[in-house]
């Protein structure tokens, strides 16, 4: 794509008014070595169009929410009807009840749900609730799992799994994260060691059941069930962060695939149909501790606003239709199979995997196990950056980070998938 001038000009202007020129760091394309990002003008279906009128097949989908594709006609119509009746009331509305009922119907492990405005708000609230319910302070998270930008989650492992949390962002006091313990994903020994040392102090484990913020790493056989068991043994809560996987890998989320019941679940992305929304829910006994039913405070000016609720209701209605996830999964599988076959044809060190409408790209042989954050760091990250640049220049918009999962929508056509595979095949051949 030769014409990128308007994006370049806009990025230079944006940097004068917005820190780094973007409102979320990954959007700057800095992690993939690009000088500037593409500024998007509009989107429709499986495509993004930038301010220079370049067209891209979109495999980000606004980082997951756009499971129906951009500007789905039914979702737009529902939103437009609601807009005429008001944007936000600051009072309860029927749409909140309807969306809550739909979520509980599709995720039976959730008995009650509270709406917030983002995934970060959802995880913050779930952790606060878990601490209050257990009367304990320490939490366990996993290296490489992202749960939003709250202070208590911005923690690196330090020198070993037993280290107390050390902040990895300036502005996060050590006292804030001293109760955040970090374990290694898929490593039960690291979890057991933490429980042995802090047995009666651990309020909860929070985990992405499929780690979508270190590309796409699946839990090894029995890992999630073992987390459930060790939480039960120690009267700690298990929180599944399904902001990314909820209604994306399956209609009932990852918990329905692995048949493991969390105490609390956090949601976002798909449940808002592209509008800002998050939620946390779980056992009624626990959720009844949330204000005003109980003492655990949580509030939000725009929480449960009718626009986001309406978009979520229509989105969940559509993805609940028989055969939806079969079709979505088939699209992702076709993409992944084609990429793997292309890499194999040229003996290129690459493999891809998928589940539902989510996929991961790994620049290493399929004979190399990638089960942890450390494993992912050993893959060819430089080659991913080259692949990203090549695909972007040829009209395929991938996540601008080797640590992020990709997303496919029901709007992607066979032609879109075939074009993507053909471009990748050419890259594998030339590199």
From Swiss-Prot:
Uppermost EC category: isomerase
Reactions that this protein is recorded to catalyse: (S)-4-amino-5-oxopentanoate = 5-aminolevulinate
One biological process term in Gene Ontology: protoporphyrinogen IX biosynthetic process
Quaternary structure and interacting proteins, as annotated: Homodimer.
GO molecular function, one term: transaminase activity
Family label: Belongs to the class-III pyridoxal-phosphate-dependent aminotransferase family. HemL subfamily.
One GO cellular component term noted in the UniProt record for this chain: cytoplasm
Cofactor(s), by name: pyridoxal 5'-phosphate
Compartments, as annotated in UniProt: Cytoplasm
Modified residues (N6-(pyridoxal phosphate)lysine): 269
Record lineage: Bacteria, Pseudomonadati, Pseudomonadota, Gammaproteobacteria, Thiotrichales
Enzyme Commission number(s) of this protein: 5.4.3.8
Keywords on record: Cytoplasm, Isomerase, Porphyrin biosynthesis, Pyridoxal phosphate
Gene3D superfamilies: Aspartate Aminotransferase, domain 1, Type I PLP-dependent aspartate aminotransferase-like (Major domain)
Primary site of residence: cytoplasm
Pathway(s) served: Porphyrin-containing compound metabolism; protoporphyrin-IX biosynthesis; 5-aminolevulinate from L-glutamyl-tRNA(Glu): step 2/2
Name by which UniProt lists this protein: Glutamate-1-semialdehyde 2,1-aminomutase
């Amino acid at each position: 794509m030769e014409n990128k001038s308007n994006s370049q000009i806009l990025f230079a202007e944006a940097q004068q008014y917005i820190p780094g020129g973007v409102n979320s760091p990954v959007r700057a394309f800095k992690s993939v070595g690009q000088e500037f990002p593409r500024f998007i003008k509009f989107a429709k279906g499986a495509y993004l169009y930038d301010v220079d009128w370049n067209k891209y097949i979109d495999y980000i989908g606004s980082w997951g929410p756009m499971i129906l594709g951009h500007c789905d006609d039914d979702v737009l119509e529902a939103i437009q009807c609601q807009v005429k009746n008001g944007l936000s009331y600051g009072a309860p509305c029927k749409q909140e009840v309807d969306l809550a009922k739909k979520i509980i119907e599709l995720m039976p492990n959730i008995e009650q749900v509270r709406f917030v405005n983002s995934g970060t708000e959802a995880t913050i609230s779930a952790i606060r609730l878990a601490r209050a319910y257990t009367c304990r302070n320490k939490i366990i998270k996993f290296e490489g799992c992202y749960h939003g930008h709250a202070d208590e989650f911005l923690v690196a492992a330090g020198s070993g799994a037993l280290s107390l949390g050390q902040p990895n962002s300036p502005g996060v006091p050590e006292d804030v994260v001293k109760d955040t313990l970090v374990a290694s994903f898929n490593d039960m020994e690291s979890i057991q060691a933490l429980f042995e040392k802090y047995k009666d102090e651990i309020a909860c484990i929070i985990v992405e059941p499929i780690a979508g913020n270190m590309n796409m790493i699946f839990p090894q056989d029995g890992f999630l069930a073992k987390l459930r068991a060790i939480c039960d043994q120690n009267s700690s809560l298990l929180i599944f962060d399904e902001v990314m996987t909820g209604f994306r890998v399956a209609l009932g989320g990852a918990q329905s695939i692995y048949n493991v019941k969390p105490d609390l679940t956090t949601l976002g992305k798909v449940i808002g149909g592209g509008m800002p929304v998050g939620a946390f829910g779980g056992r009624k006994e626990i959720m009844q501790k949330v204000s005003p039913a109980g003492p655990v405070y949580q509030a939000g000016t725009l929480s449960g606003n009718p626009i986001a609720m309406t978009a979520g209701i229509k989105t969940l209605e559509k993805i609940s239709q028989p055969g939806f996830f079969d079709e979505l999964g088939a699209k992702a599988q076709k993409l992944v199979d084609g990429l793997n076959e292309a890499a194999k044809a040229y003996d290129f060190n690459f493999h891809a995997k998928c589940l539902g409408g989510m996929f991961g790209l790994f620049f290493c042989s399929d004979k190399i196990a990638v089960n942890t954050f450390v494993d992912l760091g050993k893959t060819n990250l430089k080659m991913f950056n080259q692949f990203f640049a090549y695909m972007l220049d040829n009209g395929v918009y991938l996540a601008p980070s080797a640590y992020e999962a990709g997303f496919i929508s029901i709007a992607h056509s066979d032609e879109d998938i075939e074009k993507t595979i053909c471009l990748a095949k050419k890259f594998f051949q030339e590199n």
